[in-house]
From Swiss-Prot:
PANTHER family: PROTEIN TNT (PTHR40139:SF1). Residues 20-36, 45-61, 177-191, 207-217 have a biased composition (Polar residues). Preferentially expressed in teratocarcinoma rather than in normal testis. Residues 1-217 are annotated as: Disordered. Pfam families: DUF4694. It comes from the Eukaryota. Residues 91-104, 128-139 have a biased composition (Low complexity). This is Protein TNT. Disulfide bonds: none annotated. It comes from Homo sapiens (Human).
């Protein structure tokens, strides 16, 4: 069996090295082949053993570090969280009496709040009455505004509608009186003028006198 140095073996992919030279012959060749087989077997198996030892060595510190380092951290974290939860659970128990004490105080505050509402409503009624009084002073009643409109002579407000109607009737009466006075004056002037019969008599009077005088002549 001849082996070339540096040849790769397909199943294990390991490099095989021969330490002793191969000689031609029967006995030495068999010895060398046996020795080479043993070396090959040792070379093939030795990396596996080394790998297994390396894996065991690599796994050893990890298996020792895990139970020593990691669990205390988790335990401390769990203890801290549990203590925080206990504190948070203890705070509502302390605050609950204050809430229970504050609950019966609501009706008192409500009663106190209702009293100012009553006061404010009375105050509002007073202010409304005062505002109504001011508005009545600023806007007088129609009866009171009649004198003011008559004195001022302005009859454009809605409140003084009756006054404006009364004033219009008075003006109409005055106009009628003026018209009647003018008509009476005209009639008096016409009455002062002589009637047509008198005019005729005046015209005919001189004619008769002339005739009479002519007949006498």
């Amino acid at each position: 069996m001849s082996l070339v140095p540096g040849q790769h073996c397909s199943p294990s992919h390991t490099r095989l090295h021969l330490t002793s030279p191969i000689t031609m012959g029967t006995e030495p060749a068999t010895q060398n082949t046996e020795f080479s087989k043993g070396s090959l077997i040792y070379g093939v198996t030795s990396p596996q053993r080394g790998h297994s030892q390396h894996s065991e060595a690599s796994q050893g510190p990890l298996s020792l570090d895990k139970p020593l380092q990691l669990p205390p951290i988790f335990l401390e974290g769990e203890k801290g969280e549990s203590s925080v939860q206990n504190e948070q659970e203890g705070e509502p128990s302390l605050q609950s009496p204050s809430l229970e004490l504050q609950s019966p105080a609501w009706p008192r505050h409500a009663g106190v709040a209702q009293e100012p509402l009553k006061v404010s409503s009375s105050y509002l009624s007073d202010t409304q009455s005062s505002e109504s009084h001011v508005s009545s002073v600023q806007h007088p009643r129609p009866e009171e505004g009649s004198h003011a409109s008559l004195s001022s002579g302005y009859a454009g407000d809605k409140e003084g509608s009756d006054i404006s109607l009364v004033g219009s009737h008075r003006r109409v009466r005055l106009n009628r009186r003026l018209n009647t006075q003018a008509a009476s004056n005209q009639t008096s002037q016409l009455g002062s003028i002589d009637p047509p019969s008198s005019l005729k008599s005046r015209l005919t009077g001189p004619a008769h006198s002339t005739k009479q005088t002519g007949g006498k002549e």
